[in-house]
Every structure is written in C-alpha cells, then in structure tokens.
C-alpha cells in the first residue's frame, strides 16, 4: 500500500485594505444626471463650484461623467435633510 501525499495549498491572500466593489458602479453622463436629479446643467455645475454636489470624473479629453453611487448618495442626503426639517 502506498501513501499519497499532497503538497499543502497556499494560504489565501487577503488585501491589506478592502477593495471597493466597483462591479455595480457605473458612470452617468450629464444628461442622465440632469434626468435623475431634476436639475439643469448650469445648476449642477454651480452646486459643484460651491462644493454641494459630487464633482465629475474626467474620462479623457472633454468627456466627463459622475459616479452613480455618488449622485444617489447626494440625493439620499437631500431626502434626509428634508426629513430633518431643513434644506440639506
């Protein structure tokens, strides 16, 4: 009877910092942001200038987009502000 030996399997590698799950993330172009938020283009850029709206991400050249998660988080903040009784 022969003994069968197998080499030990390597320990799983755990990243030092958890990686964000970007598989569900997507870019929104300005027409989608306008439709989703109900804001005009000029209002979106004015709010960005004031630091009250998520800034756009450069896609190269003159192309920009927003992260869906950041826009929806901004919307949730506005809703939460309404529930607290003041304009967030």
Swiss-Prot record:
Domain of life: Viruses
Pfam family, one: Phage_AlpA
Keyword line: DNA-binding
DNA-binding region: 30-49
The keyword Amino-acid biosynthesis appears for this protein: no
Gene Ontology molecular function: DNA binding
InterPro entries reported in the protein's UniProt record: AlpA, DNA-bd_dom_put_sf, Prophage_regulatory_activator
Presence of the UniProt keyword Magnesium in the record: no
Gene3D superfamilies: 1.10.238.160
Family note: To E.coli prophage CP4-57 regulatory protein alpA.
Protein's UniProt name: Uncharacterized protein ORF88
Species in which this protein is naturally found: Enterobacteria phage P4 (Bacteriophage P4)
């Amino acid at each position: 009877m022969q003994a069968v030996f197998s080499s030990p399997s390597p320990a799983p590698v755990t990243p030092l910092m958890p990686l964000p799950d970007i598989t569900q993330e997507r870019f929104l172009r300005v027409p989608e942001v306008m439709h989703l938020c109900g804001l005009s283009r000029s209002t979106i850029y004015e709010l960005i200038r004031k630091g009250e709206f998520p800034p756009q991400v450069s896609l190269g050249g003159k192309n920009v987009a927003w992260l869906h998660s950041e826009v929806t988080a901004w919307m949730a903040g506005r809703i939460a502000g309404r529930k607290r009784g003041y304009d967030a």
